[in-house]
Amino acid sequence: MSLLPRTAEEFSSADYWERFFRKRGEKAFEWYGDYNSLCGVLHKYIKPRDKVLVVGCGNSELSEQLYDVGYRQLTNIDISETVVSHMNQRNAERRPDLSFQQLDATQTGFESGSFQVTLDKGTLDAMASEEDGALAGRMLAEVGRVLAVGGRYVCITLAQEHVIKLAVEHFVKGWAVRVHCLTGQQNEESDSSFALPVFVLVCTKFRQAPPFAVLELCQGEDGAPARLASVEELLSAVKERQAYNLMLHKLKGGTDSSSTPSLTLCHAASGRPRYTLTIQDGPPSAKTPRSNHFAIFIVPQGRESDWLYGSAEGRAQLASSAKFRRLVIVAMHRDQEYEDMQAVQSELSPVVMELAPPGMPANQQVPFLSVGGDLGWREVIGRGLSALTGEYSVEDVRGEDGYLYRRLIFMNNSQLVQSESRLQSAAAASSASKKKNKKKAKQPASTGAKDRSVDRGFLCCTHHEVMVAGLAMLGMDAINNKDQPVSVLLVGLGGGGLPQFVRDFVPCARVEVVELDPVVLDVAQTWFGFQIDDRLKVTLGDGLDHITTLESEGERYFDVIMFDVDSKDTTLGMSCPPPAFVETSLLKKVYSLLSPRGLFMLNLVCRDSALRKSVLDRVHSVFPCVFSRGIEGEVNEVLLCCRSSGEHKPHTVPQTLQQTAKDLQKTLRANSQTAPQIDITAMLNDLKVV
């Protein structure tokens, strides 16, 4: 039989507590921890000479233990006649000065200002269970009355939201409010489902109210107090600690590869995020060495967006290859300084050990793993704010291949790389104009952002490579026709790598880009080497409106129209493009804007199979011939949609495509002093009819 109240109403019922204590008899029920787990914080705020009122004392041994270590001015009150009688009998001989009285905590009858401390162990929680909190409010008012100026209300509580909110809002004016979180202090014999952390609320009475709220939170009994600006911030911080403790409770219950909880560790002083930890358990069927219980993997700085670390599938693969029962994957945050691997290990060790799987031996050595043994490298080189997408960061990072990469990150989705370009040193860029680069050649890290430039002949995104390769479907006669150069309309600029590549390497190609966000254009020009000229232009505006305007004018046609635009609505199962871009009405406008040889290319990122089928059905209703090229390891696929099936059958890949791909490869290489690093044939190898 559970001895914890089963419903909230029972907490405030005198009859319930009367029955409860009769059932317990001589066995003390240490409500919310015992003296040993609480003495550190109690001695901090209660002095042996203080006059202490213990409200709702129950048959806890806490008062007896305080008495035995020198606290002799303890007055204990409780609503239960049974417990008061029992406690007086139990202490009559051994503790003659320890008194227990049957009194209502809301009307004690004591003189105002007659106590230095009021000690409460769970009584507030019991009384606050009423919906309106009226009973608890009357008790807190009585506490304020009987305490002297400088006196303290010390309340041991589970800090459920309605309880802590009531107490803090009651004392915030005219009192200093401090909360200690004693996570993990519960009695080992407590119910296994009883996983909430214990908090100690300390409210100090001022003679004169300060001009500002004094609200503080401490971790543990000796943690430095962190000042909070509002009641809402304090309540939020308490809630975070509770959520963390509940997560720990679940993690100690067993391993579960389908659940990947994560938490963020913040800097104690600044409150800024410092580490993000993701817990990845191995599957039950995994064959792991007996001693491989637990390991910590440090993601190199700047690599947290990589598929292996930034996706659920990638993390599962990482855990499987590491061969541990549980792997904690740690990502470091930008704007934080990290000395070295040893310093990071020392900083993380006290926290990560709380995340260990059940059954791990106490003396088990826990390894810290990483790639290359260092912390990686990241340099934030630019920041800004977009009215459309919020804050952004431009940063240079070192990739797994040793090259440096420049990334555009929007902070509202910091795990996603919006745009990426490979970098080369100024010296390498200069020599590249004289000599073609070797694809596998590596370069040393440059000393500063100004010494690094974007390698415009390298496309980081595979779906961009597929789009370039798709130009082969136009035929080489069209690509090499200088009298009628290939015209391209691209919706979605990003860092500008794709349109810049087409302009630089496709003979005489003319590219028009439509971009909604002027900040994105500025970033592309400032940091990603994007250059507007007579063959590469940008129109700022809504892509849907621009296509509608072009279609209504009926004066311009394009050989290629590309959609490479993401959706800001994360609730949909499709992140590229926004749904409006694949409505039948718009697809028909795209069709009408294409030349007879025209090609429509769509970057499709859709996790919802039913939604994907709906998109494909709509595309098929407009275009007679549709091909798909999936991207390995990603959800992306590129749809290549022909305006006309031409000479080949609409349900087969053209037999001449491979030869055209080889010819396009030669043309791209011949059209520039620097060879573009792209394999056109490989990009078209897995083309499928859909």
From Swiss-Prot:
Sequence segments annotated as region (Disordered): 427-451
Swiss-Prot/TrEMBL keywords: Methyltransferase, Multifunctional enzyme, Transferase
Keyword Cytoplasm: no
BP GO annotations: methylation
Catalytically driven reaction(s): L-lysyl-[protein] + S-adenosyl-L-methionine = N(6)-methyl-L-lysyl-[protein] + S-adenosyl-L-homocysteine + H(+); N(6)-methyl-L-lysyl-[protein] + S-adenosyl-L-methionine = N(6),N(6)-dimethyl-L-lysyl-[protein] + S-adenosyl-L-homocysteine + H(+); N-terminal glycyl-L-lysyl-L-glutamyl-[protein] + 3 S-adenosyl-L-methionine = N-terminal N,N,N-trimethyl-glycyl-L-lysyl-L-glutamyl-[protein] + 3 S-adenosyl-L-homocysteine + 3 H(+)
Listed Gene3D superfamilies: Vaccinia Virus protein VP39
Lineage top rank: taxon: Eukaryota
Entry EC number(s): 2.1.1.-
UniProt KW Methyltransferase keyword: yes
InterPro entries: Lys/N-term_MeTrsfase_sf (IPR051419), Methyltransf_25 (IPR041698), SAM-dependent_MTases_sf (IPR029063)
Biased composition (Basic residues): 433-442
GO molecular function, one term: protein-lysine N-methyltransferase activity
Described function: Dual methyltransferase that catalyzes methylation of elongation factor 1-alpha (eef1a1 and eef1a2) at two different positions, and is therefore involved in the regulation of mRNA translation. Via its C-terminus, methylates the N-terminus of eef1a1 and eef1a2. Via its N-terminus dimethylates lysine residues of eef1a1 and eef1a2.
Family: Belongs to the methyltransferase superfamily.
Full protein name: eEF1A lysine and N-terminal methyltransferase
Organism this protein belongs to: Danio rerio
Gene giving rise to this polypeptide: mettl13
